[in-house]
UniProtKB/Swiss-Prot annotation:
Residues annotated as transmembrane: 52-72, 86-106, 125-145, 167-187
Signal peptide bounds: none
Name under which the protein is recorded: CASP-like protein 4B3
Gene Ontology CC annotation, any one: plasma membrane
Keyword Membrane: yes
Length: 198
């Protein structure tokens, strides 16, 4: 009777089995960082990848809204300076909050992808933080653009100039950031539901 063990050199190409990759990993005791990140990205659930991309998009548009609104100063005795309008100042403040939040969340997602562990210990706690944070930021962005849009529309009826165009552009960027944050909140809600059910 012959033993029925796995055939030697079965061609598996992973870090734990035979093959060139296994030999390379065994030589120095580690897997190359670039390969490790790519493998973790492929193993991440589609929802987690979608959330990372949506947060990156929200970060980009929040940053654009912040920059455009902060630079919206065109003189004329202060009539065309954003900081003379509380609605625009509020929109700028919310854009700053959105940039800080999405920066922290994207950094956290990249850390999890790179190192294979989350900075928040409990999975359910992390899911609650994701869902609550995305919901709050999406609501704040919507409230900011809802406050600034009527003022811009009223001023554009009297005069359509660079100041009102810049304000409209910043509001549009905030709206796109809201859409991305809202979709990210939906994904976070799905992840939270899965954690609670499982």
């Amino acid at each position: 009777m012959s033993s029925s063990g796995p055939p030697a050199g079965d061609g598996r190409d992973d870090a734990s089995g035979p093959g060139p990759a296994g030999a390379a990993a065994a030589a120095d005791g580690s897997v190359p960082v670039s390969r490790s990140i790519v493998e973790r990205w492929k193993m991440e659930p589609a929802a987690a990848r979608a959330r990372l991309l949506l947060r990156a998009v929200a970060w980009l548009f929040s940053l654009l809204a912040l920059v455009v609104m902060a630079s919206n100063k065109h003189g004329h005795g202060g009539a065309q300076d954003f900081d003379n309008y509380p609605e625009y100042t509020y929109c700028l403040g919310i854009s700053i909050i959105a940039v800080l939040y999405t920066t922290a969340q994207v950094t956290r997602d990249v850390h999890r992808l790179s190192w294979g562990r989350d900075v928040i210990a409990g999975r359910k706690a992390a899911a609650v933080v994701d869902f609550a944070g995305d919901q709050v930021v999406a609501y704040l962005l919507m409230s900011a653009l809802s406050a600034a849009a009527p003022v811009t529309d009223y001023m554009r009826q009297a005069a359509d100039n660079l100041f009102t165009d810049s304000a409209a552009a910043a509001i549009s960027m905030a709206f796109l950031a809201f859409l991305a944050a809202g979709l990210s909140a939906l994904v976070s809600g799905y992840n939270l539901a899965m954690e609670v059910l499982v």
